[in-house]
Amino acid sequence: MKIREATEQDFERIWPIFREIVAAGETYAYARDTTKEQALRIWIEVPRKTFVVEEAGNTLGTYYIKTNQQGPGDHVCNCGYMVSSTARGRGLATAMCEHSQDVAKKLGYKAMQFNFVAATNDGAVRLWNSLGFVTVGCLPKAFNHPSKGFVDALVMYKWLET
């Protein structure tokens, strides 16, 4: 398994992962019918950097890193992670989150924040907690889950400096 920086050409292999996860509507606050062009902007063009996880020529996962706020908040980054349904349970999200923290430090970020974690995404919440993230806020009924209705969204944060 290899994590490397993505190029725009990688988007053809990222798109099926993005489409599957976003269309499910269970974890990301993107429109379930997000177009390929919109997804390219969200995942490749806007972020500071995007990465892919590859194995035997297959793209198994991806993440982006970007500045969360401008000005006085520009020392805090935000990341988004996606793992192909065929590769879940293999530690890719852990590997990507650990990799992203190293990248964040190299880019000069002091902290990482996840802005809108669906509280029903138990696996992600457990993983982020195990990697040192704390829930610093709860947005009541802010996420409209397709089968569970309005559920809480969490703001999770980790100071990266030791």
Predicted features along the sequence, with ranges:
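Glycine-rich acetyl-CoA-binding "A-motif" of GNAT/NAT acetyltransferases
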Residues: 58-61, 123, 150
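Acetyl-CoA-dependent GNAT
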Residues: 27, 31-86, 97-98, 103, ...
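Helix-loop element at the rim of GNAT/NAT acetyltransferase active sites that forms part
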Residues: 15-33
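Conserved acetyl-CoA-binding loop-helix of GNAT-fold acetyltransferases
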Residues: 89-104, 125-130
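Short hydrophobic/aromatic beta-strand or adjacent loop that forms the aromatic wall/cage
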Residues: 48, 151-155
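A short beta-loop-alpha structural element at the N-terminal edge
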Residues: 2-14
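Conserved GNAT acetyl-CoA-binding A-motif
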Residues: 104-116
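Conserved catalytic-core motifs of GNAT/GCN5-like acyltransferases
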Residues: 113-117, 129-151
